[in-house]
A protein has these predicted regions:
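Structural motif
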Residues: 21-22, 50, 122-123, 167-169, ...
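Active-site flanking residues adjacent to catalytic metal/cofactor-binding acidic residues
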Residues: 26, 54-56, 86, 172, ...
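Core catalytic region of metal-dependent phosphoesterases/phosphodiesterases
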Residues: 30-118, 184, 191-196, 200-203, ...
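Conserved catalytic scaffold of divalent metal-dependent phosphoesterases
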Residues: 15, 95-187, 232-233, 247
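Binuclear metal-dependent phosphoesterase catalytic core
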Residues: 16-19, 113-118, 147, 196-204, ...
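Acidic, histidine-bearing metal-coordination/catalytic regions of metal-dependent phosphoesterases
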Residues: 1-32, 76, 249-254
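A structural motif corresponding to the C-terminal end of an alpha-helix
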Residues: 76-77, 158-167, 200-207
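Histidine-centered catalytic micro-motifs
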Residues: 28, 171-176, 207-217
């Protein structure tokens, strides 16, 4: 039986022998939730093949807290750690974080990667995502931010369509749908995500979509039989663990 301290969701058809174990979290805002993260890591009973981090590991660009956060996550002993940047990893910190932690963490910034794990090819597209309504600060300080967000939607679709792998995962910070925002005030939903990605998901058909940012939102939603997981740590208070099988198995299930 799965531990009650972790979510083990069997998506469609799971092969216990060949399934990939993926652990995911985000919104640690270190040091705010760092101690609680340490406790959560100790409760994960299954060694993951891959860790996916959906941004905001640190609070307000405090890069000094990235090291203890990654050190904690590394105790999961996964084969690979992939991360994206959230809005709290300020743009000016990206190069610094890549340089300092690039040997431990693979950072994806509107990029994709293809891995071979347990004989299964797994592709990940990683992006900060977009907002339908940029924040007041963004409007004032980032020239052309609305255009940046709209172009990113199209770029992510292109990256997913070009990804040739048994399993495809879309890893984002901002929400790709409003369906996982229930629990947040409705008037701020446009500043938490962008529904343009719903069409991307429908067209490109990733096997799993992971996002964060909505601390008080919903844990999951389903779009076109595709699981959308909001892995925000303040929402779960634990590491989210998912098992995925090969696409061939998924097709046989339906």
């Amino acid at each position: 039986m799965p531990s009650s301290t972790s979510l083990v969701r069997e998506l469609r058809n799971i092969s216990e022998k060949r399934g990939l174990v993926i652990a995911s979290t985000a919104d640690i805002h270190s040091p705010k939730h760092l101690e609680e993260l340490r406790k959560a890591v100790k409760k994960v009973r299954e060694r993951p093949d891959l860790v996916l981090l959906a941004g905001d590991l640190i609070n307000k660009g405090k890069v000094d807290w990235y090291a203890p956060t990654i050190e904690t996550i590394s105790k999961l002993e996964a084969e690979r750690i992939i991360a994206i940047f959230g809005n709290e990893e300020y743009d000016e910190t990206h190069d610094m974080l890549k340089e300092e932690f690039g040997d431990i963490v693979t950072f994806l910034d509107d990029e994709s990667i293809k891995l071979e794990i347990k004989g299964v090819s797994l592709g990940v597209v990683g992006t900060k995502g977009s907002l339908e309504q940029p924040t007041t600060w963004q409007e004032r300080n980032i020239p052309g931010i609305r255009e940046v967000y709209e172009k990113r939607v199209k770029k992510v679709e292109k990256l997913l369509m070009e990804l040739d792998s048994d399993i495809k995962i879309l890893l984002m910070h901002y929400s790709p749908t409003f369906k996982t925002l229930f629990g947040e005030y409705r008037n701020i939903w446009p500043q938490l995500g962008h529904r343009g990605y719903e069409k991307v998901i429908e067209i490109a058909r990733p096997d799993l979509v992971i996002h964060a940012h909505a601390h008080n939102g919903s844990k999951r939603a389903v779009l076109w039989n595709i699981e959308i997981l909001n892995v925000s740590f303040p929402l779960w208070r634990e590491i989210v663990v998912v098992k995925l099988s090969k696409r061939a198995d998924l097709e046989q299930y339906f």
